[in-house]
Each structure stands twice: as structure tokens, then as C-alpha cells.
Amino acid sequence: MSAQDKIIKASHLITMDDIIREGNPTLRKEASEVSLPLSDEDIILGEKMMQFLKHSQDPVMAEKLGLRGGVGLAAPQLDISKRIIAVLVPNMEDSEGNPPKEAYSLQEIMYNPKIVAHSVQEAALADGEGCLSVDRLVEGYVVRHSRVTVDYYDKKGDKHRIKLKGYNAIVVQHEIDHINGIMFYDRINSQNPFAIKEGMLIIE
């Protein structure tokens, strides 16, 4: 049974056991585009990936299933070499503890996502990046574009173009790297991990 056949079973919930770790060759492959119109199997896979992210951000479900919190997941992390990503970025409470008007600033399953334009300005998260496929702490600035324009298809096969900046842009770039066989630490300066290039935006 393939990894995808197992994951798309109605009764299956994605857990950390389904996520492959660094060193697995699938994480270093350029993933294949999915064909359109999408197969039921690829639609279900995307929905399962989004379900995993929601579970990982729910304290009760995360504890029950033993999940690490995540804001993005790419199909290659499930040992499925396809160009499918899911991103789920929650909005935070305001300074007075009030819940946000919208629960998420970005919630999307993207098929064949592609960066079609990007800013000259670079950016990195102040606290660095982590990855569900990496079980160790890797410190340093992960240098990315501060703004990106991304084309992708949704599960209906409709094409979309979105412009992203800041944290959302970083998350989507991290996941698109996965479908291109790139790990986040490839983008850290190995000689000086906390080097700041001129004009680089540090996102707190």
C-alpha cells in the first residue's frame, strides 16, 4: 500500500508517524505536478493535510495524537512526491486578549503552487524556522523574499494568484521549498548563521 493510499483512508488521521524526517530521499526530490482535473485521491490528500494542521493547532487534539504544532505541510513530508501544500496561519489575540475577527490570516490547500514574482528585499524570521521533518533545533536566519506572488490551483481546478508578505510569505516559501527538494537550513548562511544582509527585513 502506498503512503497516499494509507493516508486517504476515511478512518486515517495524519500523525507524526506519517511524516518522514530529514535524510529521507523523498525530501530532496523535485516533486511531480498533479494532473488537472484533480483526482479524488489528490483532493482527499489535501483535505487530510489541512485536517492535520488544524489538529496540530488544537491543544486537545495535539495532545491526544502527539502532534507538534505546524502552520504548513507539503506532500513530500508524507513521502508523497507531489506538488501539494497546505498552509494554516492563525491570527493571534489582540493585546487585550480578545479573539481575532478572522481565525486565520491564511488558510489554503494549494495544488502546483509556483512563485511567479518576488520582492528584491529579503526577509527572515527573528526566531528562525522549524520543520515537522526536522527533529533538531537549527539556529540562524533563513533568508527568503519578503514578498511573493504565488499562482496555484484549488481543489476545483480553479487557478488563483495571491500576493503575500511577511510571515505568510515565509510560510508559503518554506512549503514550496519542500516540493522543490529544498530544506529550510539550506538557506542559512553556514559561515555566519545570523548574518544580516543590507536591507533585509527581520520579522519578529
Swiss-Prot record:
Uppermost EC category: hydrolase
Binding site for Fe cation: 131, 174, 178
Any GO BP annotation: translation
Entry keyword annotation includes Hydrolase: yes
Cofactor: Fe(2+)
This enzyme's EC code(s): 3.5.1.88
Catalytic residue list: 175
Note on cofactor: Binds 1 Fe(2+) ion.
UniProt xrefs under Gene3D superfamilies: Peptide deformylase
Record HAMAP family: Pep_deformylase
Function: Removes the formyl group from the N-terminal Met of newly synthesized proteins. Requires at least a dipeptide for an efficient rate of reaction. N-terminal L-methionine is a prerequisite for activity but the enzyme has broad specificity at other positions.
Protein name as annotated: Peptide deformylase
Organism field: Streptococcus uberis (strain ATCC BAA-854 / 0140J)
Taxon lineage: Bacteria, Bacillati, Bacillota, Bacilli, Lactobacillales
Gene designation per UniProt: def
